[in-house]
Each structure stands twice: as C-alpha cells, then as structure tokens.
Amino acid sequence: MTDIVVAIDGPAGTGKSSVSRGLARELGARYLDTGAMYRMMTLAVLRAGIDPADAAAIGESVWKVQMLSDHDRYFLGGEDVSSEIRTEEVTQAVSAVSAIPAVRVRLVDLQRQMAEGRGSVVVEGRDIGTVVLPDAPVKIFLTASPETRARRRNDQNVASGSADDYDRVLAEVRRRDHLDSTRAVSPLYVAQDAMIVDTSKMAEAEVIAHLMDLVKQRSGAVW
C-alpha cells in the first residue's frame, strides 16, 4: 500500500476526532490529533499560572514545554494528561492560547515533524490542509450546523457525568467558531482543494465509509 497523508479540518463538534480515529484504523495509518497538542500547551500555561491572554509571557515559555503523543495518549513533561486536557477549564482557554503566534509556530513545527516521512497518517485539526500540511494529497473539511454540534457536545458531557446546558454549549460553540475564524494567525477556513463533508445527518460509521471512498478517489490507492 502506498503511504498516504490525509488532512482533516473543521470546527469543534463535527466529529473530527472519532471519525479521524476510525479512518486511520481503516487505512492502517497513524492518527495525530493536533487539537490535543494545543490543549497540552494550554494546560501547561494554566499550570504555570500564566494568563491565557498574556502573549509575551506565553511566548517566552512555549519552547520549554515538552509534549508527546503516543497512541492517543498525551504526555506533558512525561505525565499522562489525556484526561486533564479535556476539562472545561482547558476548553475555555484553548482558543486564546492557540491564537498566540509563538504557540502556533512551535506546534506547527512539531506537527510537521510528527506527520511527515513516517508512513501513512491521518492528521486532524483546524489548519492542517491550509498551514500545517498544505501539500497533503487528501484534504477533507468536516462541517455541521452549530445546533448539531452543540447537541453532540452536550450529549457527550451528560454521558460523561458532567451535567450541562444546551444553550450554554451552543453559545460556547458559536464563540469558538468566531475566535477560530477571525484570529490573525492561521484562521479556520476551507482549503481551496479540500473536499467538504457535512456530517449533520450522518452517523459516524457513514462518515468513515464516505471518507474512505474520498481517499480512494483522491489518492488512487487501493485498500
């Protein structure tokens, strides 16, 4: 099988993570969640007591942060923080930290190192096809209505035991959309050569099967 790089972008709540994992499994490829890397950086900032809006202080510390991704487990300075990076505190701060130029420079460099020249890989995030891997042969942009994404996130929160409110989650989804699409560095937008997939009315298995078809069409490879 020919090695293939698949870049998957889209806003929060479109099913990027679960679909990307499933696609990687079907392809026999590695999976890289770049959003988790921004969450690790955000956690490091919060632990250091730095204001998430203090670009100067964060810029000075960003190169000292040591992080590792291994089979969907995430390590910060050798500590497994896979659960902690998904807390509400990190979620509230991650867009602000991600918008800081020094953070993006550092993490884009790490992401390219992790993705390139190491076999087939599915990389998911918000600027993979436009900034991190602009030459990726397969680019996919997942989308869904804000209401659908808020409902999914709310259901996840309730299922995990953290009571939530749909209206609050919807407001947070819209807030993050605005921050992600208007930030000065690497804003979220659809790459010109990306294939757009609306997941609003699709089950996870349907999305994965559809993406497999798109990968085959775009790459010409056979699995």
From Swiss-Prot:
It comes from the Bacteria. Its main location: cytoplasm. InterPro entries: Cytidylate_kin, Cytidylate_kinase_dom, P-loop_NTPase. It is an enzyme of class 2 (transferase). Keywords: ATP-binding, Cytoplasm, Kinase, Nucleotide-binding, Transferase. Signal peptide: none annotated. The keyword Transferase applies. CDD domains: CMPK. It catalyses: CMP + ATP = CDP + ADP; dCMP + ATP = dCDP + ADP. It is found in: Cytoplasm. ATP binds at residues 10-18. The keyword Cytoplasm applies. GO terms for cellular component: cytosol. Belongs to the cytidylate kinase family. Type 1 subfamily. This is Cytidylate kinase.
